A protein has these predicted regions:
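Enzyme catalytic cores with a strong preference for nitrogen-chemistry domains
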Residues: 1-353, 369-378
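ATP/NTP-dependent adenylation/nucleotidyl-transfer catalytic domains that generate, transfer
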Residues: 5, 21, 158, 215-217, ...
Length: 634
């Protein structure tokens, strides 16, 4: 597993006091090492401070800065950390605003700033020159020869590839980090001195998030703090670490002490994102020049205290407000897709089987919303409840009551007589409760629904969800089949929240009460006889495992192409204290086996809308052979 801990630091500084700044930088490095940080980024011109202005022309300051870099190289010997500090660099009688990458006693490379702000409160071109066209130069310092200098430098250790840009470089139309990322950098370091203005922090944060998303990279950002000169502007010491569009860590600005934020970067995840992205591959032709890769080697990037947050419910936003917003958007996608199918076919009726369970409830809610949107009467929604051998009073009554309060055309067809006749026809003992016993019921229900759809001139709406498709937890040509499937890319963990959203925000008290009870009912196909007290005996999660685990496994398998070992590691972190390691391993093995062996069902799926980033449609997201072996994946 390729995880690496990184940090962004803002030391206390004094303007033009190099010795003081050096001491504080060392303190930050030592603290970062204690925290197992392997890459640490300091602000722009952190050795001298950013706001020295015309003092940058003073040879004394430049000499002190050079000596401080040498001091840091000596200080770094034997320390397994790469850190980037900002300082002036004089080359061919020209001064550059530069980043120095220091590791184990050496300057690995010097990266000049490409774009110099020179308007309003900024006038860097008074002192510095742009390094935009400098690539692959070899320079030297008094204490070290053969140092790479240029904007095309990539610093690589194993699968970790690091690129550097400086402050304004991020704010231009095509930042250098775009080309560095296309060339393979998965970690971008930005040494910055971005002054604070009202709402500028929000804009800056969005820039960093968007750039890390666009580059499918991590982004370590460090900006100068409040101890810079305040003659005309104020700096806030904004520190951010982003990964592929999300913020992993961010500080509270305006701190008056040395500060470090840290985060764990998932290198494998970034690699997987790029591997699947065809446009990223195609975009590589735009790289304007050859990159110069500088190889170095971390001794050990293992993390003893792995404290990276792993979301146990990756399909469900943890923030309630965001969750509600997402729920509304999902319903809009489902209803708009279904509306298009009705408009295309010209059909005016829907047929749907209602069991009193979660999936059929969500599907019915989608159909009702669609009919309301199309201004079609709810009486044209033909809802069929089909009690069988395992139907309980609880689910039966919830199905009846829900349809009643929603105002649909409710019908009831008991499948027991037809199933008994079918058992007799095929010579299957009624008391033999095996897969045939179960599938006869599922197929009988589908046959009824299909034939009624023909009779009514309606569209049969499928109710199965993404989690069931992943596990193959459906009867082939039974509940597996429909004319249009509205839940096909909604995982079970998300189904619950969608139903809950309607119960909380869009229901009468009567309907809300029914929905809450449905949410509280154990998930079951109810294909086996109920117990002597009339309760459900066939509980899906007792048979195939907890859906929250399977949804977690599915997300990481499909989203990032994660190996079984990686999924297991992440699951044990995410569900620590919820499930024992042995339980996670058991259900992961079950998931992997079922995911492969049940592909034949997914190869024959009806149409249905893709809602999130993960779908199992054989026409789009998962083109997988039905006879692939899972042995190599266990």
């Amino acid at each position: 597993m390729n995880f690496i801990k990184v940090g962004s630091a803002c030391p206390v500084t004094k303007v033009a006091d190099v010795d003081f700044n050096l001491k504080e930088i060392k303190k930050c490095v030592e603290k970062a090492i204690e925290d197992q940080v392997k890459i640490l980024v300091f602000p722009e011109l952190s050795i001298t401070s950013y706001s020295c202005a015309d003092l940058f022309f003073q040879q004394k300051l430049l000499h002190k800065s050079e000596t401080a870099i040498e001091n840091l190289c000596v200080f770094s010997e034997g320390r397994d950390i790469l850190f980037a500090v900002g300082a002036p660099f004089e080359y061919d009688d020209v001064l550059y605003n530069a980043a120095y990458l220091i590791f184990n006693g050496k300057v690995l490379g010097i990266v000049p700033k490409s774009y110099l702000p020179n308007a309003s409160e900024f006038y860097e071109k008074r002192w510095f020159s742009s390094g935009l066209n400098i690539t692959s130069r070899i320079v030297k310092l008094p204490f070290q020869d053969n140092i790479n200098f240029g904007t095309n430098l990539i610093f690589r250790s194993g699968d970790v590839s690091i690129g550097v840009e400086i402050c304004e470089d991020l704010w231009v139309t095509i930042p250098p980090s775009s080309f560095l990322s296309l060339a393979g950098c998965n970690i971008i370091c930005n040494l910055s001195s971005s002054n604070e203005l009202v709402s500028k922090a929000d804009y800056r944060r969005d820039l960093i998030k968007n750039q890390s998303a666009r580059c499918m990279s991590s982004y370590i950002y460090s900006s100068s703090g409040v101890f810079e000169s305040t003659t005309d502007v104020l700096f806030s010491g904004h520190l951010l670490i982003s990964e592929n569009g999300g913020i992993l860590s961010e500080n509270q600005r305006f701190n008056r002490d040395n500060e470090i934020i840290t985060a764990i970067i998932d290198v494998d995840k970034l690699k997987a994102e790029r591997l699947k992205n065809i446009s990223f591959r195609d975009n590589k032709v735009l790289i304007p020049f050859d990159m110069n890769t500088i190889h170095f080697q971390f001794n050990n990037i293992a993390i003893n205290n792995f404290d990276k947050y792993i979301d146990k419910h990756p399909f469900v936003p943890s923030n309630p407000l965001e969750r509600d917003k997402r729920s509304k958007e999902i319903f809009n996608i489902q209803t708009s897709a279904l509306a298009k199918r009705f408009e295309h076919t010209g059909l005016k009726k829907a047929v749907i089987g209602i069991s009193g369970g979660l999936d059929s409830t969500l599907a019915l809610l989608v159909v009702v919303k669609t009919f309301d949107m199309l201004k079609m009467p709810r009486e044209n929604i033909v809802t069929i409840t089909m009690p069988g051998f395992g139907t309980t009073d609880r689910t039966y009554n919830n199905a009846l009551d829900l349809c009643k309060y929603l105002g649909t055309d409710l019908r009831e067809i008991n499948i027991v007589p037809a199933c008994l006749q079918h058992f007799k026809d095929i010579g299957h003992p009624v008391e033999q409760h095996d897969v045939t016993y179960e599938n006869v019921q599922a197929r009988e229900r589908t046959q009824i629904l299909m034939d009624l759809a023909n009779k009514e001139g309606g569209l049969l709406i499928g109710t199965g969800d993404l989690s069931e498709l992943a596990l193959g937890w459906c009867t082939y040509n039974g509940d597996h089949m429909s004319m249009y499937s509205v839940n096909c890319s909604i995982p079970k963990t998300l189904v619950r929240y969608l139903v809950d959203y309607v119960a909380d925000h869009e229901s009468t008290p009567e309907i809300s009460k029914i929905l809450i009870d449905i949410l509280d009912t154990p998930v079951s196909p109810e294909l086996l006889p109920k117990d002597k007290d009339g309760n459900i005996t066939q509980k899906t999660e007792d048979i195939v495992g907890p859906y929250e685990l399977h949804d977690f496994f599915l997300y990481h398998l499909m989203k990032h192409g994660a190996s079984k070992e990686r999924i297991e590691f992440l699951a044990k972190v995410a569900f620590k204290g919820t499930y024992d390691d042995e339980v996670i391993s058991k259900w992961l093995n079950k998931f992997m086996a079922r995911f492969f062996t049940q592909q034949f069902k997914r190869s024959a799926l009806p149409d249905g809308p893709k809602v999130g980033s993960i779908s199992l449609s054989p026409r789009g997201d998962l083109r997988m052979p039905s006879d692939a072996s899972y042995n190599g994946f266990l």
